[in-house]
Amino acid sequence: MNNNMCAATDAEKLWYQIDWTKAENYVKNLQMRIVKAYKEEKYGKVKSLQYLLTHSFYAKALAVKRVTQNAGKNTAGVDGELWLTASAKFTAISKLQRRGYTPQPLKRVYIPKKNGKKRPLSIPTMTDRAMQTLYKFALEPIAETTADPNSYGFRAKRCTQDAIEQCFTSLNKAKSPKWVLEGDIKGCFDNISHEWIIKNIPMDKELLRKWLECGYIETKVLFPTKTGTPQGSAISPIICNMVLDGLEKAIKNVYHKRTVNGKAYFPKVNFVRYA
């Protein structure tokens, strides 16, 4: 047995020896501390805890586990690399390094929509997916803390059924509104300002800019990305949600208590956001 085979065998054993319960608890504990520090407006401590999380072995291992268990685990990015064996997965953990990291361009594909049109989907490499998932662990606690109360798309422990239930709750009373206005933000992911994201999303700014500006490859041609956050990346849904947070309050503030012909009027608007 040569050295490469020995190393692969060792890596396989080490992957199966990881205590995943301990890993989950470690990450969850740090996430709870991030939330506590954020609520107390100790933003320096938030950054320190985020750094600790994103540089920990357990968080990196969990990031690799997540991207090798989801639906896209058999779809490679531009480098053609997949992590299908236990050995490859354990070796991948050591690749998740902040120092010297440069994301590769996204692979652009198109998937059909119900209306017959096609939606662009950008596929990162396995390493980039894992890096985004790793930093998502550090960003998601803040995103969940600041999220609109009735936002249901791409949310932890929320689903389509929750959004439907909230709609039912808002509409099943005798004095409930009789009308529903459905809105759709055209090209939402594609048109978000990079500068707004960099300024307002509380995470590593340099890394965030690299992801936003890495470009995509289509028909073997590299195209730049000057606006938007790509559909298909692990961290984009959270960024999009954080961009839209505050919309519920802004809409409800328009319909505040007022007096009409000497009579107090309490207009009510129910809001449900789902992507």
Ranges and model annotations:
Residues 1-21, 25, 261-263:
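Intrinsically disordered, low-complexity and often Lys/Arg-enriched segments
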Residues 13-72, 137-153:
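Charged boundary/loop elements
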Residues 28, 32, 44-47, 51, ...:
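Non-catalytic, well-ordered alpha-helical scaffold segments
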Residues 46-118:
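Phosphate/adenylate-binding "loop-and-lid" substructures adjacent to NTP/NAD/dNTP-binding pockets
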Residues 71-84, 103-130, 146-159, 181-182, ...:
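Short, conserved non-catalytic motifs in the polymerase core
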Residues 79, 138, 186:
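Anionic group-transfer/hydrolysis microenvironments
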Residues 95, 149-150, 162-275:
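Conserved polymerase palm-domain catalytic core
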Residues 102, 141-145, 203-209:
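Cytochrome P450 catalytic domain signature, combining two hallmark sequence patches
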